[in-house]
Amino acid sequence: MSGKGKAGKSGGKAGSETKSMSRSSKAGLQFPVGRVHRLLKKGNYAQRVGAGAPVYMAAVLEYLAAEILELAGNAARDNKKQRIVPRHLQLAIRNDEELHKLLGNVVISQGGVVPHIAPELLPSKSSKGKKDEGVSQEL
């Protein structure tokens, strides 16, 4: 054995104390990489799960959650509310084209419906300010 090799599994001295670091903190994520890895293995999606797959999946889940929460927070603020409720999630998802496409078949309990009035039912803007000086409607 040469003297230039690593001493032990950690690569440092045998007696040194190193603080363990989670895979989530190594990747700079808030979502749990270890839990995602465990669920990927337990779900029988594939025979083997690579080391990078749970990190990538946790990052994608964290991004989607942040995107939905930001839009829902904006919807809550527009309604002058401090707390995000399912209605705000529904409005956020249905008003965003890409999220609506992704979650099109998802039903959000207590979400309600997105308000929409057909353009044909709205009052026409052309008749505003003009008076009919043509033939009278009286018989």
From Swiss-Prot:
S-S bridge residues: none
Post-translational modification: Phosphorylated to form H2AS128ph (gamma-H2A) in response to DNA double-strand breaks (DSBs) generated by exogenous genotoxic agents and by stalled replication forks. Phosphorylation is dependent on the DNA damage checkpoint kinases MEC1/ATR and TEL1/ATM, spreads on either side of a detected DSB site and may mark the surrounding chromatin for recruitment of proteins required for DNA damage signaling and repair. Gamma-H2A is removed from the DNA prior to the strand invasion-primer extension step of the repair process and subsequently dephosphorylated.
GO MF term set: DNA binding; protein heterodimerization activity; structural constituent of chromatin
PROSITE patterns: HISTONE_H2A (PS00046)
Keywords: Acetylation, Chromosome, DNA damage, DNA repair, DNA-binding, Methylation, Nucleosome core, Nucleus, Phosphoprotein
Compartment(s) of residence: Nucleus; Chromosome
A GO biological process held by the record: DNA repair
SUPFAM superfamilies: Histone-fold
Placement of sequence motif [ST]-Q motif: 136-137
One GO term describing the cellular component: nucleosome
Modification N-acetylserine, positions: 2
Biased composition (Polar residues): 17-27
Residue ranges of the region described as Disordered: 1-27, 119-139
N6-acetyllysine sites (modified residues): 9, 13
Pfam families the record matches: Histone, Histone_H2A_C
Comp. bias regions, Basic and acidic residues: 129-139
Major site of localization recorded for this protein: nucleus
Residues found modified as Phosphoserine: 136
Miscellaneous comment as given in the Swiss-Prot or TrEMBL entry: In contrast to vertebrates and insects, its C-terminus is not monoubiquitinated.
PANTHER family xref list: HISTONE H2A (PTHR23430)
Subunit comment: The nucleosome is a histone octamer containing two molecules each of H2A, H2B, H3 and H4 assembled in one H3-H4 heterotetramer and two H2A-H2B heterodimers. The octamer wraps approximately 147 bp of DNA.
Family: Belongs to the histone H2A family.
Domain comment (free text): The [ST]-Q motif constitutes a recognition sequence for kinases from the PI3/PI4-kinase family.
Protein role: Core component of nucleosome which plays a central role in DNA double strand break (DSB) repair. Nucleosomes wrap and compact DNA into chromatin, limiting DNA accessibility to the cellular machineries which require DNA as a template. Histones thereby play a central role in transcription regulation, DNA repair, DNA replication and chromosomal stability. DNA accessibility is regulated via a complex set of post-translational modifications of histones, also called histone code, and nucleosome remodeling.
Name of the protein in question: Histone H2A
Organism: Agaricus bisporus (White button mushroom)
